[in-house]
Amino acid sequence: RQMCIRDRPGARVLDLYAGSGQLGIEALSRGAARCVFLDENREAVNIVMKNCKNCGVFDRSRVNIGEAARFLSACREQFDLVLLDPPFRGGTLEKILPAVEKCVAPGGIVLCESETGIVLPAQTGSLTLQKQYKYGKVLLWKYTKPMQSAAEQEGEAL
């Protein structure tokens, strides 16, 4: 996680299922331009706001309460780094990953965290699985979006 976050200075970050905001705050502390945090739990949202203030990154943060699927369907922004750390069990990650694609900027990265035993696709839309890491009972999935769409690449080849 830290390597991917560190390599994105100036990034626009989306931290879905923010929890305490740890991942997004880490990105901001390593040079991300701004971070949008989302969690559906009011207590978690209050904790994220408090943590952003305590860490001195509140001015580069936008903290929202709401359901991830609804947020993504209405989202008109694109992000360079999307962090997905939903609650384990329940199939949340498998359901939400396809909806994330439209919010990922060309050349963007999606980092997903899950429990072991989960199987995610090697490709979902324009997102391609680059690496999978295992840390004890946790899996980290790194997806990337190409700088150009396949249609744009074909057009240049002609």
Which sequence ranges carry the predicted segments?
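Class I S-adenosyl-L-methionine-dependent methyltransferase catalytic core
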Residues: 2, 6-158
